[in-house]
Amino acid sequence: MKTTIILILLTHWVYSQNPISGNNTATLCLGHHAVANGTLVKTITDDQIEVTNATELVQSTSIGKICNNPYRVLDGRNCTLIDAMLGDPHCDAFQYEKWDLFIERSSAFSNCYPYDIPDYASLRSIVASSGTLEFTAEGFTWTGVTQNGESGSCRRGSADSFFSRLNWLTKSGDSYPTLNVTMPNNNNFDKLYIWGIHHPSTNDEQTKLYVQESGRVTVSTKRSQQTIIPNIGSRPWVRGQAGRISIYWTIVKPGDVLMINSNGNLVAPRGYFKMRTEKSSIMRSDAPIDTCVSECITPNGSIPNDKPFQNVNKVTYGKCPKYIKQNTLKLATGMRNVPEKQIRGIFGAIAGFIENGWEGMVDGWYGFRYQNSEGTGQAGDLKSTQAAIDQINGKLNRVIERTNEKFHQIEKEFSEVEGRIQDLEKYVEDTKIDLWSYNAELLVALENQHTIDLTDAEMNKLFEKTRRQLRENAEDMGGGCFKIYHKCDNACIGSIRNGTYDHYIYRDEALNNRFQIKGVELKSGYKDWILWISFAISCFLICVVLLGFIMWACQKGNIRCNICI
């Protein structure tokens, strides 16, 4: 009986005794910042991982207008660039204009003699990149023909007129002699000459204007030669005309000579455009032009270039983000987010980074929570926080530097004859976009992985630094917490945080408390044995008491037991 009582008391003592006095020990936990609702990002190893903060890397909207600063933007209004270059009467205001970017509107139209340009896209690109319509007249001598032809389809004011940069030559009297004209280029720059050939709608119109039943135009330089024969025939009526003019162009290098030979149908040049090697360009857009500042322009409008990627438009001008297919790519600028649990383990509000993050930290990404004789508290660790921030801060700028284009992506145009070239160019362009889209996703995933790894590493560094300070004065409780075996007030906690903690000062006290606690602390395996032994003895005692009661009752006659055989 005495043995039973001793075992019961021992079992009660194991579970009720608190060997750690609140005044002689403390609990210190290390943790990191957390938010209630984080942001999902992609890493190399995870498609979705939650972080405390992230920055969007894809610009998906424009500001809806084109900024006229820092680039010189010229609004074409009702004129195309080619009409302005040819000298269409309603585009006279554009003579000698200059631009960085020429904006062509969908409302632009031609208002002169109907024409076509077999190599329209190339001529448009050359003139656009030159950045000016500066024109120099030259003294061509056209003997035996009538100059300055006019048309009722091309009116300047109330009078019949023609393209101001071209000279329509027709017969003089009843003759149209063969013309041979040369014009040397004695300058140190390339000259662009625009000329053409007239296609009458009928044979009668051909002989009426040029005498010969069929004319011919040959334009030559040392490097090239073009011979064009008019195609006589009726065409759909445009501005009252069934005839057409085909426009051609020739570039004459310094030291070269322009030679023109014709016996009819010639639309002659009046001079040349000075070729410039600028980074000017042209863009089709209906976005309004406004006074603002933006270094990147798209047909949708200007866009900020503070992000490395954009999916607003493939066509851009200026210093622009790289076009990709993705609508969103997020760069992690915070650590892995583990939202704080509402109910935690045996330490209540004191739980370390292994278990979860801490919400409400305002003085750092990493910090300490403690419980001692003076109560509980929390404080950030600025050094580890700053170390993580310094490594993350430069990420966005580095990604922008790697991806922003310092040039423009022009529109690609090809004639129907060049359909195969257009298909090939489109395939190449689409392949480039696919490649950049893949590279962008991979680059961001790598950066996100690095961010999460380095923020985790800073947490581990802080934990190891604290563990090395405390040494044998504390025990790692797991979960990012330490049990300190000596009295550690707020000043003591502060010394641990700032790295001035001297474990020798508290060594004796900690060892003494640790031995006292360990001396009476029973391991979980022995507790289980005691419980089972206690349970068995208790059951035995109950059986003995019950059997004794039955025997006593039988002796007194209170219980009767009949055994029948």
UniProtKB/Swiss-Prot annotation:
Pfam families: Hemagglutinin (PF00509). It is a single-pass type I membrane protein. Disulfide bonds join 29-481, 67-292, 79-91, 112-154, 296-320, 488-492. Residues 551-565 are cytoplasmic. Its main location: virion. GO terms for molecular function: host cell surface receptor binding. InterPro entries: Capsid_hemagglutn (IPR008980), Hemagglutn_HA1_a/b_dom_sf (IPR013828), Hemagglutn_influenz_A (IPR000149), Hemagglutn_influenz_A/B (IPR001364). Keywords: Clathrin- and caveolin-independent endocytosis of virus by host, Clathrin-mediated endocytosis of virus by host, Disulfide bond, Fusion of virus membrane with host endosomal membrane, Fusion of virus membrane with host membrane, Glycoprotein, Hemagglutinin, Host cell membrane, Host membrane, Host-virus interaction, Lipoprotein, Membrane, Palmitate, Signal, Transmembrane, Transmembrane helix, Viral attachment to host cell, Viral envelope protein, Viral penetration into host cytoplasm, Virion, Virus endocytosis by host, Virus entry into host cell. It is found in: Virion membrane; Host apical cell membrane. Homotrimer of disulfide-linked HA1-HA2. Binds to sialic acid-containing receptors on the cell surface, bringing about the attachment of the virus particle to the cell. This attachment induces virion internalization of about two third of the virus particles through clathrin-dependent endocytosis and about one third through a clathrin- and caveolin-independent pathway. Plays a major role in the determination of host range restriction and virulence. Class I viral fusion protein. Belongs to the influenza viruses hemagglutinin family. This is Hemagglutinin. The gene is HA.
